[in-house]
Amino acid sequence: MSFAHRHLLGIEQLSPADITAILDLAETYVALNRQSAKHSDVLSGLTQINMFFENSTRTQASFELAGKRLGADVMNMSMQASSIKKGETLIDTAMTLNAMHPDLLVVRHPHSGAVDLLAQKVNCAVLNAGDGRHEHPTQALLDALTIRRAKGRLHRLNIAICGDIAHSRVARSNLILLGKMENRIRLIGPPTLVPAQFAEFGAEVYDDMREGLKDVDVVMMLRLQRERMDGGFIPSEREYYHRYGLDREKLGLAKPDAIVMHPGPMNRGVEIDGTLADDINRSVIQEQVEMGVAVRMAAMELLARNLREAT
């Protein structure tokens, strides 16, 4: 299995073969994680540092669990109490960490490009856990694995991505990945949240959700990212749900076996009807969480192999 990358900074750097290699390896970890003994030693002797400059629950927990199940020594750095809060630059922090000789750095940062900058200053492997509006590669990979397992393939599907696309690194990474795998993508949302430049990705853009959902195989809902908005993007949450919230009536326009996805955390009654989110016959939201651990285990193993081959 060939994977010739030192870091995982974005989906843009990956070929379709790279994507398939990660997903195929992740499949083996799905099986491992369902066993009573969920342990491997492929990262034994390696140190993983998780640096989250933005608050996170599920992503940080997923990376921590992935590292521990692979046998790594895992450390979570509290960025709220870090030297950066005292005025230290990101580059100084990177150089300080580099002097400690970690093997894997998992980084989330509110500014686009910050993780790439940090990766240029360290000797270890760096995994991007989300940077600003830029990318969230492991989320796109876990979404891809979820789709492949549910639909039996990851190509030539009609996939709708709905909601706050303007502020979403998840949308951008999924657009790139799903495009590389030759799927047909539709972007659905109000013009304020689906900028025209996203059509450059080869996607069809709809501001009418009912029209956009016709005959799709996958419906991927996105969270309204109010923390990245400065007002005026939507008239009200009630009006937004009426036009762009996923309910059973709107889902009825998709294919009968269409699956429902959401990267979380969800705003029930705003982006998606709560009972639909919990419907095990349509929703694969819990499967996405499960696939996240397996995908991150696979990505870290592939990067660790390259680390060891380089020494």
Swiss-Prot record:
GO biological process: 'de novo' pyrimidine nucleobase biosynthetic process; 'de novo' UMP biosynthetic process; amino acid metabolic process
Gene Ontology molecular functions: amino acid binding; aspartate carbamoyltransferase activity
Pathway assigned in UniProt: Pyrimidine metabolism; UMP biosynthesis via de novo pathway; (S)-dihydroorotate from bicarbonate: step 2/3
Entry keyword annotation includes Ribosomal protein: no
Residues given in the record as L-aspartate binding sites: 86, 169, 223
GO CC aspect terms: cytosol
Tagged with keyword Transferase: yes
Gene3D superfamilies documented for this protein: Aspartate/ornithine carbamoyltransferase (3.40.50.1370)
Residues that hold carbamoyl phosphate according to the record: 58-59, 108, 136, 139, 264-265
Leading EC class: transferase
Alphabetical UniProt keywords: Pyrimidine biosynthesis, Transferase
Alphabetized PANTHER family for the sequence: ASPARTATE CARBAMOYLTRANSFERASE, ORNITHINE CARBAMOYLTRANSFERASE, MITOCHONDRIAL
Subunit composition and interactions: Heterododecamer (2C3:3R2) of six catalytic PyrB chains organized as two trimers (C3), and six regulatory PyrI chains organized as three dimers (R2).
Family under the similarity heading: Belongs to the aspartate/ornithine carbamoyltransferase superfamily. ATCase family.
Protein's recorded name: Aspartate carbamoyltransferase catalytic subunit
Species per Swiss-Prot/TrEMBL record: Ruegeria pomeroyi (strain ATCC 700808 / DSM 15171 / DSS-3)
Gene from which this protein is expressed: pyrB
